[in-house]
């Protein structure tokens, strides 16, 4: 692996010990979403910064990432999360499987003739967890995204024995997507500990859109038995200055409310 660039495809554990520690009492949360491109990394990053400001030593994992440019790893989700930590850990300790193709993890793994090892991810997670007072694990896509012929993201959450935060859009159709996601989590015995409503794209401020968004938010709050945070409006700064955008989002009252909720009601 040259110049700190990630070793695409092949997992490497060279930067961490593979001696399993005892189960940690430290706070750990799985970050999932109703879909891809909803803003998991954005919300994870904001929570990392918010909790760091409260004095917590925060760790992150993005065990599987697809669509990663090996020439610009710093622009990947993993690279951006890595940049928030001090000192920055090795890329490979955050992301065990990095694929260049922007397709589903199982399709990527098959294209490269490998199998994503959920048990191996769990081993790496427990080590990272022991080193931090708070740890976030970010998934890929939604909860039923296949990782291997036998395991989905949901199976990974079960294997890690973590509660989950679900990031959802506020656009039309999100009520159905979110309720299906919650049903899938509950069906596997996974505890959803929060819903974050996020606008990952600029909004069209016409009357129809505003009505759709307002009604979607209202119905999610009405139908959810899980605490709802947000909505978080699209952050234009994120596209031009990612770090500054994340600092701004970390100061958002709803991110603070979510961070406090996690600390005070440790799942």
What is the predicted function of each stretch?
Residues 183-267:
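C-terminal lobe/tail of nucleotide-utilizing enzymes
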């Amino acid at each position: 692996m040259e110049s700190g660039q990630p070793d695409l495809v092949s997992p490497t554990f060279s930067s961490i010990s593979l001696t399993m520690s005892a189960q940690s009492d430290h706070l750990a949360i799985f970050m999932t979403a109703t879909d891809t491109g909803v803003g998991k990394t954005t919300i994870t990053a904001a929570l990392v910064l918010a909790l760091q400001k409260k004095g917590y030593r925060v760790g992150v994992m993005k065990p599987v990432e697809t669509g990663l440019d090996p020439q610009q790893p710093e622009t990947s989700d993993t690279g951006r999360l890595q940049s928030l930590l001090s000192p920055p850990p090795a890329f490979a300790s955050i992301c065990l499987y990095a694929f260049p193709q922007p397709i589903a993890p199982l399709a990527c793994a098959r294209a490269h003739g490998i199998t994503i090892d959920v048990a191996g991810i769990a081993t790496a997670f427990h080590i990272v967890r022991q080193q931090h007072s708070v740890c976030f694990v970010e998934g890929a896509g939604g909860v039923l995204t296949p990782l291997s012929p036998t395991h989905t993201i949901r199976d990974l959450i079960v294997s890690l024995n973590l509660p989950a935060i679900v990031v959802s859009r506020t656009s039309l159709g999100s009520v159905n997507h979110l309720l299906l996601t919650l049903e899938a989590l509950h069906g596997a015995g996974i505890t959803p500990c929060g819903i974050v409503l996020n606008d990952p794209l600029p909004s069209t401020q016409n009357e129809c859109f505003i009505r759709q968004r307002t009604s979607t938010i209202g119905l999610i709050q009405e139908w959810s038995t899980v605490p709802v945070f947000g909505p978080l409006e699209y952050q234009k700064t994120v596209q031009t200055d990612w770090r500054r955008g994340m600092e701004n989002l970390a100061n958002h009252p709803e991110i603070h409310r979510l961070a406090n909720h996690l600390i005070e009601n440790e799942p």
